[in-house]
């Protein structure tokens, strides 16, 4: 089974964070590539654990996926933007 996802990578201090969207799985590494590898492994484990518990279909549907030709298709991203908000707090 093939499940696609999009990865965002950013730096926090000396670590790089990789976030798999829309699965909401994240991991980190000392380099961007190590962070990507770590999040790929985290996604594999997350999906395997979900399948073992019988919740994979529900999790994928809640994340916006749909089943097409035996593959789960995620949302099509129209854009990724960095936004900001002014607040009184």
List each model region and its residues:
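Short aromatic-glycine-(Arg/Gly/Cys) micro-motifs in beta-strand/loop hairpins
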Residues: 3-22
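Short, flexible helix/strand-to-coil boundary loops that buttress conserved ligand/catalytic motifs
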Residues: 20, 29, 60
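Short, charged, surface-exposed hinge/linker loops at domain edges
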Residues: 1-4, 33, 37-89
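A short, exposed loop/beta-hairpin motif centered on an aromatic-Gly-Thr core
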Residues: 23-34
